[in-house]
Amino acid sequence: MAHQRIVGPTIECIESRIESRRNHYGRFVIAPLEIGQGITVGNVFRRVLLGDLEGACITSVQIPGVNHEFSTIHGVREAVLDILLNLKEIVLKTQSQETQRGHLSVQGPSTVLARDLQLPSSIELVDPDQYIATISGRVSLNMEFTVEVGKGYQLPDYEKKKTFQVDVLPIDAVFMPVTKVNYTVEENYGGDRSQERVIIEVWTNGSINSRQAIDLSVNKIINLFSPLQNVRSIEHEPLVKEKDSKMTEVLVEELDLSVRAYNCLKRAQIHTVSDLLSYSQEDLLEIKNFGRRSAEEVIEGLQKRLGIHLPKEKFTKD
């Protein structure tokens, strides 16, 4: 019984759940695919999901009186390095592409959480309960920070820091909204040995859900390949232009050939470059007593002296 062939693959979400505010999960099926396409499709989606989707995060911090990340703050339990690591984990979402500033000012004793961050209206917190620090004494913790939008993972820009004020502390930024991607390829899809399917599992940090991540990835992939639909035909110019017709009347003697190669061409009634143009590289080898070395002499002579390239394959004769 012949199986009905589906025109193209579709993407279907077969499982979706929110495990926590910062952990969204989804499982998707892409099918049907031709045998061998699954691993290609899976790899493309994995790379785009992890590397091409934008996210927002804190990329630098200013804390009054702190000049480097190995400092401590009186009355604050965490060292500055630990505070920076906690700020690095704060998950934000925004529709703006602009670099923005926020600040924090908390009087102790207090537990400092993400909800204490004072952010521009265009930036939202995914998990207001994310922990930042504990102020154990009657002191205040103050800071200003920068929020940027980007892709992938970005190491602290220490070169850029040289242009900052002394107390600006850069943070290695993890912009990726997708935290993990797995995929498997299953053959014999629908009982058809010529088809397979891809199952993709996606985990996100909650700034977008898994369905949004897949949708954004599809758009990225389409935008990458759609310009390639407009393939332009490039009309190849003839090997020798009309204005160069005089060039074709050059005698083979002027190609600086060996006596053996020259005599073979003469015996084959090849007297000018014009005569040579009716031969391919393979055709030359069929001339009596004309070996590969002689053919290479002719090819090199045409290229160096006249800029003419003989085609490699044998001409088809009607």
From Swiss-Prot:
Q: What is its EC number?
A: 2.7.7.6
> SUPFAM superfamilies from the xrefs?
C-terminal domain of RNA polymerase alpha subunit, Insert subdomain of RNA polymerase alpha subunit, RBP11-like subunits of RNA polymerase
UniProt catalytic activity:
RNA(n) + a ribonucleoside 5'-triphosphate = RNA(n+1) + diphosphate
Q: A single GO molecular function, which one?
A: DNA-directed RNA polymerase activity
Q: Where in the cell is it found?
A: Plastid, Chloroplast
Does the record carry Transcription as a key word? yes
Per UniProt, the keywords (alphabetical) are: Chloroplast, DNA-directed RNA polymerase, Nucleotidyltransferase, Plastid, Transcription, Transferase
Q: Which CDD domains match?
A: RNAP_alpha_NTD
Domain of life the protein comes from: Eukaryota
Pfam families reported in the protein's UniProt record: RNA_pol_A_bac, RNA_pol_A_CTD, RNA_pol_L
Q: Name one GO cellular component term.
A: DNA-directed RNA polymerase complex
Task: Spell out the residue ranges making up region: Alpha N-terminal domain (alpha-NTD).
Answer: 1-232
- InterPro entries the record matches: DNA-dir_RNA_pol_insert, DNA-dir_RNA_pol_RpoA/D/Rpb3, DNA-dir_RpoA, RBP11-like, RNAP_asu_C, RNApol_insert_sf
Q: What is known of its domains?
A: The N-terminal domain is essential for RNAP assembly and basal transcription, whereas the C-terminal domain is involved in interaction with transcriptional regulators and with upstream promoter elements.
Family named by the database record: Belongs to the RNA polymerase alpha chain family.
| Record note on quaternary structure | In plastids the minimal PEP RNA polymerase catalytic core is composed of four subunits: alpha, beta, beta', and beta''. When a (nuclear-encoded) sigma factor is associated with the core the holoenzyme is formed, which can initiate transcription.
By what name is this protein known? DNA-directed RNA polymerase subunit alpha
User: Taxonomy-wise, where does this protein's organism fall, top ranks first?
Assistant: Eukaryota, Viridiplantae, Streptophyta, Chlorokybophyceae, Chlorokybales
